[in-house]
């Protein structure tokens, strides 16, 4: 059963059974009009994802709540995100979208009791912003809007905003630097930092959506102004050598001078969500963030011209290379695979067919990294440099078009995320099939008795070593995107061609309400 593309379980049995989360049986030999386009099939799949979410939530609730995450092999709690209950806060927007009032109430009660001024560990401004601040602001927007029926006491919703303000006030000393570029690693108890003189492109450039939204809701401009000041150095990069191609910049910034220290260009970890937020800020408010859009367009066009790459053995696949010191790096990874969805969003909002076409090519390439492995799950890292193929992977590279450089999978969402965008832009049911196959593979290989765990090797049939960790983004992202692609139209769904987005997803998949003059 492990590694199989479909678990043959009766479609009616959408409850949990001891060994697996029950999934509807899909006959791959049926005509596509039945197996791919049936509303009944989509409903069954959405319910199966919802059942998997509840299974993981109950395991976390029993063995780890109110800690940050569950270690789902040893069934012990972990606190990698300051002990404030990251899995609960990250799960909230998904529980709202899945219409789970009991889960929503439990998390709201928990959030009301968090003391964000207290922690025993260093605090990441970036991670705290995207998971905690983004999770609470998103839930506030949703529960004040399409999810309002889920909460009987409006005061519980107002607590989300109050706690968001308290958290931002705890964190804002990070911006108290000579340039306004924030420090990332913070000791919030004594308002000190780890002493680093640099910050990263993504960790600096992935704050502006959440902090701006907080200002817009509250009417206090301070929060957005802080994030936008740090961002301003990224929009006007210096020195010129740090921008080897128009719009594409290095990933390390000097906090004291605002100057970039390198020219390493990537859409992967360390850089990724800076580019992601450039176009998303324009989706959020076209009136204020036109320059962000212009920089994204410039970066996107340069990416197509300079970084687009295909393996020598699979010219049908498209990946995005890295660049530094005059040389392309023919390597990528799971984190980079958000890029297809980001290009598709840009194509939709700007009516640019070239971005849409390239986005679909990237989705195809990243899905191929899933389809080729023994588990049908993609690896953390991969390459396609024909001069660097490991001897043991020569045949694999010939057939797959890539070789694995880092074999683990820690429940990352980016491939399913981009497949979701592809479906929203095309309504081609093949993307629902791809997302379903990925979800089934994750369920088959990473599931434990209480949740889902990171695995050591996606190219061994059982996934290899179980790493005994369940990241909070399983709840926020993997489950949400897997559910949304099979779900009916709703305000929070990404708009297709010609449509208008009512929400924009932060990098942790928390939907933030698009700005309007009435907020």
Swiss-Prot record:
InterPro entries, per the entry: 6hp_glycosidase-like_sf (IPR012341), Glyco_hydro_47 (IPR001382), Glycosyl_Hydrolase_47 (IPR050749), Seven-hairpin_glycosidases (IPR036026)
Enzyme Commission number(s) from the entry: 3.2.1.113
Cysteine pairs bridged by disulfides in the record: 337-366
GO terms for biological process, alphabetical: carbohydrate metabolic process; ERAD pathway; protein glycosylation
Entry keyword Ribosomal protein: no
Cofactor(s) required, per the database record: Ca(2+); Mg(2+)
Predominant location category: secreted
Carbohydrate attachment residues: 187, 443
Pathway, per record: Protein modification; protein glycosylation
Transmembrane segments: none
Domain of life, per lineage: Eukaryota
GO MF term set: calcium ion binding; mannosyl-oligosaccharide 1,2-alpha-mannosidase activity
Cofactor remark from the record: Ca(2+). Can also use Mg(2+), but with lower efficiency.
Catalytic activity reported: N(4)-(alpha-D-Man-(1->2)-alpha-D-Man-(1->2)-alpha-D-Man-(1->3)-[alpha-D-Man-(1->2)-alpha-D-Man-(1->3)-[alpha-D-Man-(1->2)-alpha-D-Man-(1->6)]-alpha-D-Man-(1->6)]-beta-D-Man-(1->4)-beta-D-GlcNAc-(1->4)-beta-D-GlcNAc)-L-asparaginyl-[protein] (N-glucan mannose isomer 9A1,2,3B1,2,3) + 4 H2O = N(4)-(alpha-D-Man-(1->3)-[alpha-D-Man-(1->3)-[alpha-D-Man-(1->6)]-alpha-D-Man-(1->6)]-beta-D-Man-(1->4)-beta-D-GlcNAc-(1->4)-beta-D-GlcNAc)-L-asparaginyl-[protein] (N-glucan mannose isomer 5A1,2) + 4 beta-D-mannose; N(4)-(alpha-D-Man-(1->2)-alpha-D-Man-(1->2)-alpha-D-Man-(1->3)-[alpha-D-Man-(1->3)-[alpha-D-Man-(1->2)-alpha-D-Man-(1->6)]-alpha-D-Man-(1->6)]-beta-D-Man-(1->4)-beta-D-GlcNAc-(1->4)-beta-D-GlcNAc)-L-asparaginyl-[protein] (N-glucan mannose isomer 8A1,2,3B1,3) + 3 H2O = N(4)-(alpha-D-Man-(1->3)-[alpha-D-Man-(1->3)-[alpha-D-Man-(1->6)]-alpha-D-Man-(1->6)]-beta-D-Man-(1->4)-beta-D-GlcNAc-(1->4)-beta-D-GlcNAc)-L-asparaginyl-[protein] (N-glucan mannose isomer 5A1,2) + 3 beta-D-mannose
Subcellular location: Secreted
Record keywords, A-Z: Disulfide bond, Glycoprotein, Glycosidase, Hydrolase, Metal-binding, Secreted, Signal
Pfam families membership: Glyco_hydro_47 (PF01532)
A single Gene Ontology CC term: endoplasmic reticulum
Signal peptide stretch: 1-22
Subunit organization: Monomer.
Primary role: Alpha-mannosidase involved in the maturation of Asn-linked oligosaccharides. Progressively trims alpha-1,2-linked mannose residues from Man(9)GlcNAc(2) to produce Man(5)GlcNAc(2).
Similarity comment: family membership: Belongs to the glycosyl hydrolase 47 family.
Protein known as: Mannosyl-oligosaccharide alpha-1,2-mannosidase
Species this chain originates from: Coccidioides posadasii (strain RMSCC 757 / Silveira)
């Amino acid at each position: 059963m492990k590694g199989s593309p479909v678990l043959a379980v009766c479609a009616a049995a959408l409850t949990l059974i001891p060994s697996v989360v029950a999934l509807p049986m899909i006959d791959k030999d049926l005509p596509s009009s039945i197996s791919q386009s049936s509303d009944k099939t989509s409903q069954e799949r959405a319910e199966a994802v919802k059942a998997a979410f509840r299974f993981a939530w109950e395991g976390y609730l029993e063995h780890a709540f109110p800690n940050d995450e569950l270690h789902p092999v040893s069934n012990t709690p972990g606190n990698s995100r300051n002990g404030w209950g990251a899995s609960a806060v990250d799960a909230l927007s998904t529980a709202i979208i899945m219409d789970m009032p009991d889960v929503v109430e439990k998390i709201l009660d928990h959030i009301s009791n968090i003391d964000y001024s207290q922690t025993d560990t260093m605090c990441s401004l970036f991670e705290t912003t995207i998971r905690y601040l983004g999770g609470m602001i998103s839930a506030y927007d949703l529960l004040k809007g399409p999810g309002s029926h889920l909460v009987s006491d409006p005061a519980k919703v107002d607590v989300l905003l109050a706690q968001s303000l308290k958290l931002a006030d705890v964190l804002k000393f990070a911006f108290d630097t000579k340039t306004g570029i924030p420090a990332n690693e913070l000791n919030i108890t004594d308002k000190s930092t780890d002493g680093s003189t640099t910050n990263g492109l993504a960790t600096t450039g992935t704050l502006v959506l959440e902090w701006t939204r907080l200002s817009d809701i509250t009417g206090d401009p301070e929060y957005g102004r802080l994030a936008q000041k740090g961002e301003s150095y990224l929009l006007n990069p210096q020195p010129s050598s740090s921008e080897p191609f128009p719009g594409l910049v290095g990933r390390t910034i000097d906090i004291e001078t605002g100057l970039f220290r390198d020219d390493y260009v990537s859409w992967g970890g360390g850089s990724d969500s800076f580019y992601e937020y450039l176009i998303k800020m324009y989706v959020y408010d076209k009136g204020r963030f036109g320059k962000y859009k212009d920089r994204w367009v410039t970066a996107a066009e340069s990416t197509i011209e300079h970084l687009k790459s295909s393996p020598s053995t699979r010219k049908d696949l498209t990946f995005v290379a890295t660049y530094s010191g005059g040389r392309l790096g023919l390597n990528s990874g799971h984190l980079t695979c958000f890029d297809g969805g980001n290009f598709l969003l840009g194509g939709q909002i700007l009516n640019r067919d070239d971005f849409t076409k390239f986005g679909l090519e990237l989705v195809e390439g990243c899905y191929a990294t899933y389809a080729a492995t023994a588990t049908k799950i993609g690896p953390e890292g991969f390459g396609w440099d024909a001069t660097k193929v490991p001897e043991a992977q020569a045949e694999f590279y010939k057939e797959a078009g890539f070789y694995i450089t880092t074999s683990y999978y820690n429940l990352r969402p980016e491939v399913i995320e981009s497949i979701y965008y592809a479906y929203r832009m095309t309504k081609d049911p093949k993307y629902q099939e791809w997302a379903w196959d990925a979800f089934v593979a994750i369920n088959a290989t990473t599931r434990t008795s209480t949740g889902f765990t990171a695995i050591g090797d996606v190219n061994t049939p059982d996934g290899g070593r179980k790493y005994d960790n369940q990241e909070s983004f399983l709840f926020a992202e993997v489950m949400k995107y897997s559910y949304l692609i099979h779900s009916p139209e709703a305000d929070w769904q990404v708009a297709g061609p010609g449509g208008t987005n009512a929400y924009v997803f932060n990098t942790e998949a928390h939907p933030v309400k698009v700005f309007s003059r009435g907020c």
